[in-house]
């Protein structure tokens, strides 16, 4: 099985996509590059601007049109921040937020086995544990990323991140060292 990832947005998304690639590779998938054939197409979306939302939808629409039998996945900040809108995007076979990333593989397996469309977006809860997503190597970057937190508690009027992440979740400092 081949899986292709498309990542929009910040370095956090790049890091999370790297972790997902590693997870899929460890479970027998081959990573396909943009333009190559694949059985699964996953967009890790950004919602800092509505342009990011639009690019995510456009990419998945194109992949679904070009590969009607493939599984398409919309994940990331866009479905987390706007779950009702993202759930209505029917070109995605799996719509999930930025919570339980490791469940993406399990849900993709269900879809490959013939399961119906899955929408799995859960709001973040206060006290929720930071999700460990280790990345052993970065294919396209010369520098590694160390993810230390998700979200922000600042509540700036112009920023959507607190809508997407709700509560700040931080990595234990000593485990970073």
Tell me the role of every PLM-derived stretch.
Residues 1-169, 175:
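Proteins enriched for Cys/Gly/acidic motifs involved in redox and nucleic-acid/cofactor modification
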């Amino acid at each position: 099985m081949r899986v292709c990832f498309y990542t929009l947005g910040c370095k956090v998304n790049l890091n999370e996509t790297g972790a997902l690639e590693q997870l899929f590779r460890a479970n027998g998938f081959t990573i396909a590059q943009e333009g190559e054939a694949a059985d699964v197409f996953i967009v890790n979306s950004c919602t800092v601007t509505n342009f990011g939302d639009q690019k995510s939808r456009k990419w998945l629409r194109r992949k679904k049109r070009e590969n009607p039998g493939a599984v398409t996945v919309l994940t990331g900040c866009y479905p987390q921040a706007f779950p009702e809108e993202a759930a209505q995007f029917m070109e995605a076979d799996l719509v999930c937020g930025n919570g339980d990333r490791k469940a993406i593989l399990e849900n993709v397996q269900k879809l490959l086995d013939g399961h119906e469309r899955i929408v799995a977006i859960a709001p973040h809860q206060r006290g929720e544990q930071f999700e460990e997503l280790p990345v052993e190597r970065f294919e396209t970057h010369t520098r590694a990323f160390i993810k230390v937190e998700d979200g922000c508690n600042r509540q700036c009027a112009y920023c959507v991140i607190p809508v997407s992440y709700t509560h700040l979740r931080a990595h234990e400092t000593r485990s970073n060292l």
